[in-house]
Amino acid sequence: MAQKINPLGFRLGVTQNDRSHWFAQQRNYSKDLREDQKIRTCIENYVRTHIKSSSNYGGIARVEIRRKIDLIQVKIYIGFPNLLLIEGRGQGIEKLRNDVLNMLDSADRKLHIAIEKVAKPYRKPNILAEYIALQLEKRVPFRKTMKKAIELAEREEVEGIQIQIAGRLDGKEIARVEWDRGGRVPLQTIRARIDYCYYPVQTIYGVLGIKIWILEE
């Protein structure tokens, strides 16, 4: 029988890299791990609440965290950076930094946040998943949404993409799984540069789960 495994963890060290870079003693490891999750959640909530791009969604591709003795370095890869989030313009970065520090409840630690724009945002599954979630919240038909997302990814010259949506699609009483694919997506090959994300979205019919696999060149 098939064994389910996260595609990113399956390829870690081969075609995928860690998104947190730090070392901790055993007694502090779980604490730092929870802090990383809180930092990512705080950043995502801030972007969704305060930053409205032309597409009406944040467009965060990933968040990388590096830790030193008294310094936390956070690098946000974003597809559609608002002027308030670009370094040197406005107070967006400073307000975000203060929000994260208040959440960590640690006044003696330094935090540095950097923003990097993603050249081709629709090659990133997290950004595509946000786009699909926005369309589903607006009650756009899920098949139309999947086909449009595949078109956006193919314009960015991805080699292959697979999208799966599960839940009460179109408000039907029985939940089901629907998927669509463009190009090739060899999930069983470790050497294939597969990027993946899972994104839940709350609709009036319940929670839908979105999974996206993208084969990069």
UniProtKB/Swiss-Prot annotation:
One GO location term (cellular component): cytosolic small ribosomal subunit
Localization per record: Plastid, Chloroplast
Residues making up the signal peptide according to the UniProt record: none
Molecular function as annotated in GO: rRNA binding; structural constituent of ribosome
InterPro entries given in the database record: KH_dom-like_a/b, KH_dom_type_2, KH_sf_prok-type, Ribosomal_S3_C_sf, Ribosomal_uS3_bac-typ, Ribosomal_uS3_C, Ribosomal_uS3_CS
Domain KH type-2: 47-119
Domain of life, per lineage: Eukaryota
Record keywords: Chloroplast, Plastid, Ribonucleoprotein, Ribosomal protein, RNA-binding, rRNA-binding
Subunit structure: Part of the 30S ribosomal subunit.
Protein name from the UniProt record: Small ribosomal subunit protein uS3c
Organism: Pinus koraiensis
